[in-house]
């Protein structure tokens, strides 16, 4: 056994140690499913496994708590598998090698899997600890959270009976989450033809770079500049007075990232060349002043190029540039339920020429309110459809609308105050969690999310703060005792 099994509370660390010895990559959860089923059988726990591989175990109430509502303890069983390049490790076969490093537990050159292994461990500990006082308990372990929320999407509708759900997949002790955003991606496809470039044109390449970028959920309220929108503004300006002809546009990559870089290749008539360059300098100066406080490293450059052979047909150019300028981007609405939380947003993620006849524009919408998510999706579709694009959407995933009046939240906050003499931070996140999908199948659920402190998740620097695990455990037990 590892040295971590001597840490307190030992019953939690012993379960975590056992979990680290079972390979559990996303989409390869067969062995951890077998581990969980064996655990249930060994401890005479009722259990059920659905078609996708999710496992739920049930423990009866302790004497005197039989009339309490059932509480679901939820965690995901898969882990992100990353290692340093100089480490020999097979995530399909090898156990995680844990070590204590000061006040932290980490792995030897790999991800630790405390996301969400420590949540699993706490749930298993509750199931076998006879000293814990609680009403009926269901422990739900989902598959493939990390790469597609597959377990939550495919959760059997007869798996759960509980009224309250405690998600154990949070990474900051002292915080209680009560909401998350749902999301949907939109892809607009412009069909185009290339035409022979006109004679007597001077061609340029404009580059926007060194923007901060960031996560399109967590960072969308920070005023980060979108590189695709910025390049489109220059093109729009040039089309008004200088007969600008577009040849190429490329910007952004990931659907869930605010784009940091973009460039375009275009031409203007030689007779307008000097005037256009002067206009560009004024335009660039205006942008630098506009972005000075929120994008201090913003860079825009214009370089003349050799003659280009082909340019975009005029109709597609008009539709593309005008829609990129006009499509909404950034924060659409703030939450009235949780002060400071973004409720609804959209991110113009990428613009790509694909093959010989398509331009593909990807936009990502988020909202903690399902109807608002649909509305912002409709806004985006309307702009691109009016511009002549074919528009399609992903299946999307639902949000978890914050309920500050939730009885479970009130009991969890009170429990935290009693235990630690301080107020927890009650928050919601403008990104996706499994909780929104649970609500879709079980709309009467009340939910909260909390956990110990993790840092460096999804990387070989992942580590779990030892001192926060007892606080996490104590809070969980107090919630179970008082709901």
How would you name each of these model-derived features?
Residues 3-104:
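Acidic/His- and Gly-rich active-site-bordering loop/insert found
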Residues 8-12, 336, 343-357, 364, ...:
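Zn-dependent metallopeptidase/amidohydrolase metal-coordination segment
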Residues 17-21, 263-265, 299-311, 349, ...:
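A short beta-alpha structural unit
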Residues 65-163, 203, 314-318, 328, ...:
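Active-site metal-coordination/substrate-binding segment of hydrolases
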Residues 77-79, 140-148, 170-173, 212, ...:
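Acidic, glycine-rich active-site loops and adjacent beta-strand->loop/helix elements
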Residues 103-106, 146-147, 152-366:
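Midchain, well-structured core segments that form catalytic/ion-binding scaffolds
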Residues 219, 226-228, 232-249, 394, ...:
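Active-site-adjacent substrate-binding region
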């Amino acid at each position: 056994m590892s040295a971590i099994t001597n840490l307190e509370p030992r019953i939690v660390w012993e379960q975590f140690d056992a979990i680290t010895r079972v390979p559990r990559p996303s989409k390869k959860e067969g062995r951890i499913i077998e581990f969980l089923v064996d655990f249930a059988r060994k401890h005479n726990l009722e259990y059920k496994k659905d078609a996708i591989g999710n496992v739920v175990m049930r423990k009866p109430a302790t004497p005197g708590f039989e009339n309490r509502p059932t509480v679901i303890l939820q965690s995901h069983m898969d882990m992100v598998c990353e290692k340093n390049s100089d480490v020999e490790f097979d995530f399909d076969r090898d156990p995680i090698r844990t070590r204590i490093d000061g006040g932290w537990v980490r792995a030897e050159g790999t991800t630790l899997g405390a996301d969400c292994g420590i949540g699993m461990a706490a749930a298993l500990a509750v199931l076998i600890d006879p000293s814990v006082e609680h009403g009926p308990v269901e422990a739900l372990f989902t598959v493939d959270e990390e790469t597609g929320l597959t377990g939550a999407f495919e959760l059997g509708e007869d798996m759960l009976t509980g009224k309250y759900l405690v998600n154990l997949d949070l990474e900051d002790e002292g915080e209680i989450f009560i909401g998350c955003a749902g999301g949907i991606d939109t892809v607009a496809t412009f069909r185009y033809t290339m035409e022979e470039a006109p004679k007597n044109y001077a061609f340029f390449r404009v580059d926007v770079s060194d923007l901060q970028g960031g996560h399109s959920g967590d960072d969308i309220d920070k005023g980060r500049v979108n590189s695709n929108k910025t390049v489109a503004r220059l093109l729009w300006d040039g089309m008004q007075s200088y007969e600008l002809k577009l040849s190429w546009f490329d910007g952004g990559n990931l659907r869930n990232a605010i784009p940091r870089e973009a460039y375009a290749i275009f031409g203007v008539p030689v007779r307008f060349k000097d005037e256009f360059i002067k206009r560009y300098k004024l335009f660039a100066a205006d942008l630098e002043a506009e972005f000075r406080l929120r994008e201090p490293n913003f860079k825009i450059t214009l370089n003349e190029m050799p003659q280009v052979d082909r340019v975009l047909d005029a109709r597609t150019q008009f539709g593309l540039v005008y829609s990129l300028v006009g499509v909404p981007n950034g924060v659409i609405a703030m939450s009235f339920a949780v002060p400071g939380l973004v409720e609804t947003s959209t991110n113009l993620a990428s613009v790509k020429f694909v093959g010989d006849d398509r331009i593909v524009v990807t936009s990502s919408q988020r909202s903690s309110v399902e109807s608002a998510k649909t509305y912002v999706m409709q806004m985006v579709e309307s702009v691109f459809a009016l511009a002549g694009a074919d528009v399609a959407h992903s299946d999307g995933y639902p949000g978890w609308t914050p309920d500050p009046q939730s009885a479970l939240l009130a009991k969890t906050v009170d429990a935290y105050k009693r235990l630690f003499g301080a107020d927890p931070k009650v928050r919601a996140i403008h990104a996706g969690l499994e909780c929104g999908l649970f609500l879709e199948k079980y709309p009467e659920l009340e939910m909260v999310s909390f956990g110990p402190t993790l840092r460096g998740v999804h990387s070989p620097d992942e580590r779990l703060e030892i001192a926060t695990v007892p606080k996490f455990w104590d809070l969980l037990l107090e919630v179970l005792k008082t709901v």
